[in-house]
Amino acid sequence: TRCVPDRRTRIRSGTGRNIVDKDDKSDIVMQLIDEKNLTTVENICQYDPVRPSIPCEWRIANGNKVFFKGVKSFDMRYVTEMSAACCVSFKNTVPKSEMEMVSSVHSGNIAIFYTVWSTRKGAGREIIFNIVDYLKEHKPNVKRYVTLSPKTEMAKKFHLRNGAKLIAENETTYNFEYFV
């Protein structure tokens, strides 16, 4: 069995309004960013250590999503106190490489977690499981939750420790699946 992260953190979607969960004493909210908030995506993705080469525009095009856990600035354009971020694409097949993923424009029922990073211990795990919960509720057509992870020992340990199963070892990537 896996430990379930604190369910008090909720994902907020929409225009990027900073809506804080009243139970969360840290004033940090997890939020979905849509295509109207390119400035926010640019602000977040400039720190992406996993896949910095993926353009910000692609990350929110064709149904792709960017989630973050942090606080937005007063003018709603910048993120402060960010503890985690995760980018998700929806595909019909599991990609074996970054190039394969970005060259496909088809949307599907497999959620591909292609980048996740955090600045606080445990925040990466929290954001993954919070996103899975969000997708189960808001995108019930999603049937699988799979990663496109760099082929590193750190990524391997992270996903295995969090209950994922290694389903493919590719030339430059791993695919892990979360059976939740």
Could you describe each region identified by the protein language model?
Residues 21-65:
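Short amphipathic alpha-helix that is part of the acyltransferase structural core
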Residues 118, 145-157:
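Conserved beta-strand-loop-alpha-helix junction that forms the acyl-donor binding cleft
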